[in-house]
């Protein structure tokens, strides 16, 4: 693949000069001793063992000469009849990229989380012995550092990290949300220690000098995403070098997946694997109700306490939030995809700052259609070195008195795009509709472009009002 070749050459170019490999058909021939870029227009100079040189040009070579370019030059210079595969095996030493610098960068954006709940306590014989506070662990990433200029830094974690179905709401602040949430930045480690009984009779905890008190902003049980916040001056008092995560534009099967979490509450640690599947439905019960969640499947090892931590690609960009694992197979684990993460987080932050106390947490809309898919296929893009699955999204039925009914969607329509405020957003998978719905707000105008009876049709538009939305 083009991308892979560029990575390979980027790794071995430095070694080309350092170890002086012999690009020779046989030992008696003149061989290449080095290759350097000698200009800004893609010109490379080849140095030979007899002291001579030659040049060749690689168009658009800002990313470096590729292994295939070297192979072609080798054939031209030596006349050797060797296959590309043999050339790679003989002369090209390709090492896996070192992700240590990537991890180091991501650690600036990562916290371990402790969430405190009052819940029933049981002895070893499963007999109820009363109520007390307990602490659960997870992780979080820094999402936004005062971007909306409100003096706060916003964090993202899993909803199930800060929500406990077993919490006693009457004793836990009239809520299943943690009554206290603290975070620790990497390098400023700490953990809570029991410090006697509080005025409420429950165990109190000392979070130490490095513990950062966090405030719950809102969450979505249907996305398994929650947002926390802290005054920016408070978190920067611990470390002024914190960074918000970089967000990936996309992700692909086979791509590196680096998880940073708080396994077993033993401190932030790093594991690495790849994305196995871009779209898998899993079932979780967070609040006692089983729900289906669209997830990335990864073979990256994750453990109890990894929940809420970031999943990063090899460039250090966030591609998801780890949230679930398979207890029977450590190589099957899951993460919330980045479009759901950011869609939900932005949604929560919007409603937390809209000045309306009646709107909290996250909201989405229901278009009022049932859809099916057909014609699914994998499409490879040689320009990126990746591929993706596409499918036709077909309207199976339209519910009466809904947005879809009002704008004129019809059974049998094939949805091509959703138009939001005049901007077309392509619909190539059924889940695109729910992902985009997370980004919609009251006042947005929506319409659809569909294929109907062999023609392209644009429906009428509908301007969303808050009553079109429901809490998720």
Spans of model-derived segments:
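Collagen/collagen-like triple-helix sequence repeat recognition
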Residues: 27-93
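C-terminal cap/linker of serine protease catalytic domains
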Residues: 98, 178-181, 318-386
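Active-site loop architecture of trypsin-fold serine endopeptidases
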Residues: 159-174, 235-242, 260-273, 282-308, ...
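PDZ/PDZ-like groove recognition
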Residues: 226, 301, 350-442, 449-451, ...
């Amino acid at each position: 693949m083009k991308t892979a070749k560029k990575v390979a050459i980027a790794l071995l170019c430095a070694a080309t000069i350092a170890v002086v490999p012999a690009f020779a058909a046989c030992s008696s021939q003149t061989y290449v001793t080095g290759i350097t870029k000698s200009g800004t227009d893609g010109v490379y100079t080849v140095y030979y063992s007899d002291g001579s040189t030659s040049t060749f040009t690689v168009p658009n070579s800002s990313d470096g000469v590729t292994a295939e370019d070297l192979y072609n030059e080798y054939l031209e210079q030596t006349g050797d009849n060797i296959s590309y595969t043999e050339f790679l095996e003989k002369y090209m030493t390709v090492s896996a990229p070192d992700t240590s610098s990537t991890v180091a960068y991501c650690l600036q954006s990562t916290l371990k989380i402790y969430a405190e709940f009052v819940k029933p306590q049981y002895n070893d014989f499963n007999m109820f012995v009363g109520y007390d506070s307990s602490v659960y662990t997870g992780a979080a990433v820094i999402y936004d550092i005062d971007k909306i200029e409100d003096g706060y830094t916003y964090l993202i974690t899993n909803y199930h990290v800060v929500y406990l179905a077993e919490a006693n709401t009457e004793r836990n602040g009239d809520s299943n949300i943690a009554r206290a949430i603290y975070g620790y930045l990497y390098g400023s480690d700490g953990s809570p220690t029991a410090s006697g009984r509080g005025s409420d009779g429950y165990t109190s905890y000392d979070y130490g000098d490095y513990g950062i008190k966090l405030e719950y902003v809102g969450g979505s049980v249907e996305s398994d995403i929650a947002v926390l916040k802290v005054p920016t001056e408070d978190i920067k008092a611990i470390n002024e070098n914190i960074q918000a995560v970089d967000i990936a534009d996309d992700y692909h099967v086979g791509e590196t997946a680096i998880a940073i979490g708080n396994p077993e509450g033993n401190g932030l640690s790093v594991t690495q694997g790849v994305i196995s599947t871009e779209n898998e439905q899993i079932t979780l019960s967070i609040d006692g109700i089983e729900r289906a969640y669209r997830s990335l499947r990864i073979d990256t090892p994750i453990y109890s306490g990894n929940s809420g931590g970031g999943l990063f690609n090899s460039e250090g960009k966030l591609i998801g939030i780890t949230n679930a694992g398979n207890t029977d197979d450590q190589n099957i684990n899951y993460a919330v995809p980045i479009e759901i993460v950011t869609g939900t987080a932005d949604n929560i932050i919007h409603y937390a700052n809209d000045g309306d106390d009646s709107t909290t947490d996250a909201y989405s809309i229901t278009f009022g259609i049932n859809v099916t898919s057909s014609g699914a296929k994998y499409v490879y893009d040689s320009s990126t070195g990746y591929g993706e699955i596409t499918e036709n999204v077909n309207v199976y039925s339209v519910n009466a008195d809904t947005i879809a009914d009002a704008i004129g969607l019809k059974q049998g329509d094939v949805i091509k795009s959703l138009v939001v405020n005049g901007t077309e957003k392509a619909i190539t998978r059924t889940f695109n509709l729910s992902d985009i719905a997370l980004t919609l707000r009251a006042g947005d105008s929506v319409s659809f472009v569909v294929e109907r009876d062999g023609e392209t049709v644009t429906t009428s538009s509908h301007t969303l009002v808050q009553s079109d939305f429901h809490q998720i």
